[in-house]
């Protein structure tokens, strides 16, 4: 099946097998490997991308359902919120193994786009769908709060 997607600001025409999730289109067809496979059932968050600015799990999102929508992967995250999150991640040395980080960062940027001043409970609630086997949850929470501070300082 031929589908046209807009990925990281550019239009791409891809030929995908019926039932192929967006995750595999991104990784295998477009060679955008920052988006990770974790569970395949939308439970871990490693595959999070933005579709029209909304964080979605690419392992259960199908290209034919989002044709014409803007897909943003970690490679293309250039929003104000995305830059603040990446700066905070580096400042607070959040990463351990790093496998979940692209999904964590995409979710955090989505939260801050919706709510620029989240409280700790809002951060936890929004990020709870992102699993980290290294248990960096406290550092993730601190980095999201720091990114909110960066955004506030820059406004």
Where are these regions (language model features)?
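Signature of N-terminal electron-transfer/Fe-S-associated modules in redox systems
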Residues: 1-155
């Amino acid at each position: 099946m031929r589908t046209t997607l807009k990925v990281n600001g550019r239009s791409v025409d891809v030929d995908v097998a019926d039932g192929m999730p967006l995750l595999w289109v991104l990784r295998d067809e477009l060679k955008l490997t920052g988006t990770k496979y974790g569970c395949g059932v939308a439970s871990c968050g490693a595959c999070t991308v933005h579709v029209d600015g909304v964080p979605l799990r690419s392992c259960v999102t199908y290209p034919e359902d989002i044709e014409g929508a803007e897909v943003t992967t970690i490679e293309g995250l250039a929003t104000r919120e995305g830059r603040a999150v990446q700066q905070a991640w580096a400042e607070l040395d959040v990463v351990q193994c790093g496998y979940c980080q692209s999904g964590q960062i995409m979710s955090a940027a989505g939260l801050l786009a919706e709510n620029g001043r989240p409280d700790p409970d809002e951060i936890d609630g929004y990020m709870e769908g992102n699993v980290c086997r290294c248990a960096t949850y406290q550092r993730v929470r601190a980095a999201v709060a720091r990114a909110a501070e960066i955004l506030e300082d820059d406004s």
